[in-house]
């Protein structure tokens, strides 16, 4: 029994590390579109997947490390805000269901959108004191919406393949 638990924890650690690496690369370089106050990327879709597959501490680590490293490479001033915001957006998701795409995880996309928009708005105000920080809300909405769509597509594909049952059970 202890060996099975240790194996499961090892799988979670390895998957969290893989997700952190994927999040870093996809955020920093794959379809990296600059905006006035930041950039649009597809890394959040993998944060949503990590949050739907891994227990909470592992999902938080994958999101914080992956997104934090991406910002350290591309926009270092945002690292602290990003680590906090990305850690928070995983909280409403669950990995306890049999499927990645379930009602709770679909609803979790709404608080993820709110936390992203409000979090980066506040960070922009704190960092730059700019009243134009509200202009960054629209690119953040576009980013979260695009990432949500990719998350659903990937999640449905992984569910159809029985990924959770084969790898995590």
Identify the residue ranges that each predicted region occupies:
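Loop-helix junctions at membrane interfaces
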Residues: 1-169
